[in-house]
Amino acid sequence: MIAEDEWLVVIDRQRVFAESEWSAWACPDGSYHTTDEAFARLAKAFGDRVVYTRYVAPESPQNAWVDYFKDWPQFLVAPDDPMYDLTADTAELAQGHAVVSCDTFGKWGSVLSEAIKGAKKITVCGVATDCCVLTT
């Protein structure tokens, strides 16, 4: 049972991580989509208490990001580039919910805290748990 004061934070369900036909960052062999049904059930169960996040490339990479994007220059694009869009099914579920964009792997910060209204109980879900989910 989900507590009335618990929020769901959905981490980076984006095209760049879903579409392995063109994205080297995508989950291999379309495995991203094996989570679609479970994710949709979870998002619906939380109702209005869901916030979505998007990874976007930093406008001007600094520090470790400089070397990182030497290996991945094709992903150093504007935040509104379609590769950083939420996947279609996620975008549909996200309508009417806050979407927090961050240029870091971890999404925790004041913007996300405000979006979940300072809730102390949260559930975090995403696909690449070894990266953005874990660091959030």
What name fits each language-model region?
Residues T129-T136:
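Short glycine/serine/threonine-rich phosphate/pyrophosphate-binding segments
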Residues M1-V99:
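Active-site acidic carboxylates
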Residues P79-T129:
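Internal catalytic-core helix/loop-beta-alpha segment
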